[in-house]
Amino acid sequence: MKVDEEKAGVKKLDPTSYKRRQPEQDFPSIHIGFPVPSYSQRKSDSKGHLSGLQKVQWSLKPGKPQQELAGPGIRASSQGGAVDFTKRTRSPAAEQLQDILGEEDEAPNPTLFTEMDTLQHDGDQMEWKESARWIKFEEKVEEGGERWSKPHVSTLSLHSLFELRTCLQTGTVLLDLDSCSLPQIIDDVIEKQIEDGLLRPELRERVSYVLLRKHRHQTKKPIHRSLADIGKSVSTTNRSSARSSSAGPTLHRSTEDLRIRQSTSYGHLCHAQSRSMNDISHTPNTDQRKNKFMKKIPKDSEASNVLVGEVDFLDQPFIAFVRLVQSAMLGGVTEVPVPTRFLFILLGPSGRAKSYNEIGRAIATLMVDDLFSDVAYKARNREDLIAGIDEFLDEVIVLPPGEWDPNIRIEPPKKVPSADKRKSVFSLAEPGQMNGSVGGGGASAGGGGSGGGAGGSGAGGVGSGDEAEMPAMHEIGEELIWTGRFFGGLCLDVKRKLPWFPSDFYDGFHLQSISAVLFIYLGCITNAITFGGLLGDATDNYQGVMESFLGTAMAGSLFCLFSGQPLIILSSTGPILIFEKLLFDFSKANGLDYMEFRLWIGLHSAIQCLILVATDASFIIKYITRFTEEGFSTLISFIFIYDAIKKMIGAFKYYPINTDFKPDFITTYKCECVAPDTVNTTTVNASAPLAPNTNTSLYTPLNLTALDWSLLSKKECLSYGGRLLGSSCQFVPDLALMSFILFFGTYSMTLTLKKFKFSRYFPTKVRTLVADFSIVFSILLFCGIDACFGLQTPKLHVPSVIKPTRPDRGWFVAPFGKNPWWVYPASILPALLVTILIFMDQQITAVIVNRKENKLRKAAGYHLDLFWVGILMALCSFTGLPWYVAATVISIAHIDSLKMETETSAPGEQPQFLGVREQRVTGVMVFILTGISVFLAPILKYIPMPVLYGVFLYMGVASLNGIQFWERCKLFLMPAKHQPDHAFLRHVPLRRIHLFTLVQILCLALLWILKSTMAAIIFPVMILGLIIVRRLLDLIFSQHDLAWIDNILPEKDKKETDKKKKRRKEVHETAEKEVAMPQFLPPSVVKIPMEGIPSDPQNGIHCVARKRSSSWSYSL
């Protein structure tokens, strides 16, 4: 049954004239809403569409026509029979939005900048003044109009959203308006209002005059201004006062000009001139171009302008929503030079300014909502916009008025939820929305978005609550798929990496790369010196600091040039050092040549690595989950922290603090130079340096018998053969304390400067620059402090001549001639241990670097990485250089130093992590600098070793950030009420989390014990043991718990996915059957056959039917 609104006497509604009905009011309206079946429903398509239900609205009021809430052109169904209460988790608004938004692969819409201007009255003068703005969060002009508020989350009243919904239902909606100037837009809107009977023709000029008033924007001025700025402001003030004196005549001239233009024609061209004091131009003015706020607005953004105000000549609101075909520059309407695409106008009678302002804030907040902005761009009619508001209401959260002060501004969250999660409810295979009808009689059945509503049998949810909020599955990239072909994985890695090879070089030309190179370079040379010295001690200088420098430079640069993942940094590791020591001791005890024996072990290990590459053995890495990754990376981080502190404590042994110093016995502390017992009359060269106060004029050449030994310095005394005598001769200034200051100061300052990026001081670019170069600034500062004090702190010593550390060895190791023949095949067994160590170290580090949290867009290359590690192992074995493998901590530090974030972010929005600057330049430059460090020895000798130990400590601590294991360890020391809101704490019982963490701690302790003893030779085997332990955890923990605190293993992952697909298919088939079958009415539902109640306008009975767009209904 379709009702003609005009015949029924329906008038348009004033959305702001909402009044609470009093009990004593005569003839109250009765609104009865219930769903009516539409059997003309089309069958669900591939997207799972279900047609919306319909709602019939009654009003019984004698002598007074019905006020319509529905839009025009809406049909109703009057068929009787049983009502179809389909159990659905989606609201009709969500169904309609799915049809509006279409496919997800379409190009994204521009970001919207929304500005709200309110009409200000000053006597007879009026102007539009900017009162708030939005990009993501709301910023208000503070009281007094001198500054912007902090960005905050918009808090809207539910009533304002309902009023906005009614505004769009009753007002003028112009979609795809072909206009390019504000006067033309205003004329089109007014003409449409007059045609629809919403505005009297005699008010045309007055409304147009108000809407074309001058726009004054909020500008921010710095507190400290230069003299030039003060001079400009004074001259500007003089010109402003001159203009203000002639404001009255200008007003009349503008009004007269308006009458003349409108009397001639209503068709304006795009080059029409402004008719107001605003002098609206098509091009941005100087103030707009100089506005620094433009930096916060993303590129290619568009604007939506909201104009709200009250006037005394209107008796009902003037409401319009406009979308332009093409965005247009409206001159001074917008604060920044951004073209306008949307315009919302609300002018109403006087006395309701606060209500108008709240409606304006509501539409402005909706326009910056990710989902509603997409709806606004793609809406085809008024009903689509209403559906967008209804979807917003489906997800809205209401705060009780007695428990929350609306004046409190909510700080923007650190992480804003994506609109993709809300879009996912448009599919039948997804759980329901936040809000919806309960039971079976509403438009959307039970959709508990938090996991509760989707699981009930009566709610008709698709799946359980666990499925609704399960974390992302353990994703295995295509790089780890077993091909079954000889070198199949390696060939695919090469094909994947070749297209990216040119960009791997030009992507590295960025300022951020400089700080990354310096940071990693200092870490690498410190590592090379440390492990070089330890190798020299362990192998009797067959391998030392010089071999460590050259090997690091050669292996690292070749790997970064040709590997699959150039962000990985190669270095010597602790297990390799232990293996080298055991191998040297075994060779020495059995009379074998160490270098030749080592060469054959390296060759066999290289061949074994190539066999693993040829058979795609790297695919077993997919069984390495978070459990193994975190255990390995945490162990390496602890090793770095432990070694840094151990080195620092060692300084206290060489330069102890003088704890025996007693101030009372200061007179007994002395040290003097004593001549040798037998002093010959031997003369010495007079060119030898003496103390400044030594008298050398009496003896030339120098005669030791005539020398005053008590005046010589310590260095002179020892050089002339004298000896030091006294209780204070062994006193050393507090070098240990100074070393600790340098060590801890470097670490703490680096940590502070890294966090400075997120502080509130200085502009964003300055903070970013300081954070990127934090390591460099810290090293330079504390090197300067050390130089100022002039204490003999231990310095960095780099070899200055390129030659082997041991004089009796060369740069090439002969494979034959020094060991028995059986050594060559027998070396396969120790080579197998080395291969396991290399494979696990390399591939676990690669998994950590390539994890999805780093958002790497270029393909990984596990097989290609292992191939080059094997080749480099053979090359280093022939040249007698150390073996190299991926260094976990330094690689993580390399990733962190190259992270990219959004350059422009909305006020209040945290910079979004974009990914990592993937390139080969930084790695190659680091290792080239390491190689030429031999020639930089005169400069590097000024760097104190405690400063480099501080860099080591920072690397170890920084690599612990973001590790879930470390966060779970902290929970042992926190009461439950103070624990952070981690996602796994919401879904897994705390005792199960503690049990899982204890298992990891025990495994980590066992690995640490093995690493610290001679049993470290089996360390790589124990890393494989972590994978076995993880598989055994499936017997203790459920797959649900493991999905949150770890990852599901691949075969379990596949089973879970197949089970979910099967369950969703069954639910989808059941939903289709229920749509085709009529169901019985629940006992709580009253059925009213509409065909039996005819519309009778004479008796005041009006039946108005409209399409049901949501579970929300708002009646005035």
Curated annotation (Swiss-Prot):
The keyword Metal-binding belongs to this UniProt entry's keyword annotation: no
Question: What residue ranges lie in the Extracellular compartment?
Answer: 537-558, 622-631, 752-768, 841-865, 944-945
Which cellular compartments is it found in? Apical cell membrane; Basolateral cell membrane
Report whether Signal shows up as a keyword of the record.
no
**A GO molecular-function term, please?**
active monoatomic ion transmembrane transporter activity
Q: Which reaction does it catalyse?
A: 2 hydrogencarbonate(out) + Na(+)(out) = 2 hydrogencarbonate(in) + Na(+)(in); 3 hydrogencarbonate(out) + Na(+)(out) = 3 hydrogencarbonate(in) + Na(+)(in)
Q: How does it sit in the membrane?
A: Multi-pass membrane protein
What processes in GO biological process is this protein linked to? cerebrospinal fluid secretion; epithelial cell development; mitochondrion distribution; monoatomic ion transport; regulation of gene expression; regulation of systemic arterial blood pressure; renal system process; retina development in camera-type eye
Q: Where is the composition biased (Low complexity)?
A: 233-247
| Keywords, alphabetical | Anion exchange, Cell membrane, Ion transport, Membrane, Sodium, Sodium transport, Transmembrane, Transmembrane helix, Transport
Question: Which GO cellular component term is one of those annotated?
Answer: apical plasma membrane
Q: Where is the signal peptide?
A: none
Start-end of Basic and acidic residues biased regions? 1-14
Which portions of the sequence form the region Disordered? 1-92, 222-257, 431-467
Q: Which Gene3D superfamilies match?
A: Helical hairpin bin, Mannitol-specific EII, Chain A
Gly residues bias locations? 437-464
Topology Cytoplasmic: residue spans: 1-515, 580-600, 653-730, 790-819, 887-922, 967-987, 1030-1116
Known role:
Mediates sodium- and bicarbonate-dependent electrogenic sodium bicarbonate cotransport, with a Na(+):HCO3(-) stoichiometry varying from 1:2 to 1:3.
Give the NCBIfam families listed for this entry: ae
The record's family statement is: Belongs to the anion exchanger (TC 2.A.31) family.
Q: What is this protein called?
A: Electrogenic sodium bicarbonate cotransporter 4
